[in-house]
Amino acid sequence: MAKKITAFIKLQVKAGQANPAPPVGPALGQRGLNIMEFCKAFNAATSKLEPGLPTPVIITAYSDRTFTFVTKSTPASVLLKKAAGVTSGSKRPNTDKVGKVTRKQLEEIAKVKEADLTAAELEAAVRTIAGSARSMGLTVEG
């Protein structure tokens, strides 16, 4: 018989830097899960990623106080800000432009995000990322 799922916990944790401090500790502690076990497993799973990049993770908690987790790719907004060299998006995206991204940068971001996007082909994924860039106040070149 399969284990009974008690909760899905969605968090954004910096790659390779999970520790028992908030938000990880309280979210797992109130479900009775082993916090240090998660931290070690998450840090090992994200060791190949650039340290400090926020990484979404979905933790499945079971009734016997065990868990599994799935990491997603870094949010597109974070990757776009990094590519454009800005710290935040525009407060008025249609009037105030804060930076530029090239078509090549969009393709690289689309390849990173490919598994999490529903786009059937790379071109559609690039258009999705370009839309995110425009909504942040970035100019898309190319």
Swiss-Prot record:
It comes from the Bacteria. InterPro entries: Ribosomal_uL11 (IPR000911), Ribosomal_uL11_bac-typ (IPR006519), Ribosomal_uL11_C (IPR020783), Ribosomal_uL11_C_sf (IPR036769), Ribosomal_uL11_CS (IPR020785), Ribosomal_uL11_N (IPR020784), Ribosomal_uL11_N_sf (IPR036796). Pfam families: Ribosomal_L11, Ribosomal_L11_N. One or more lysine residues are methylated. Coiled coil: none annotated. PROSITE patterns: RIBOSOMAL_L11. One of its GO terms (cellular component) is cytosolic large ribosomal subunit. Keywords: Methylation, Ribonucleoprotein, Ribosomal protein, RNA-binding, rRNA-binding. GO terms for molecular function: large ribosomal subunit rRNA binding; structural constituent of ribosome. GO terms for biological process: translation. Forms part of the ribosomal stalk which helps the ribosome interact with GTP-bound translation factors. Belongs to the universal ribosomal protein uL11 family. This is Large ribosomal subunit protein uL11. It comes from Xanthomonas euvesicatoria pv. vesicatoria (strain 85-10).
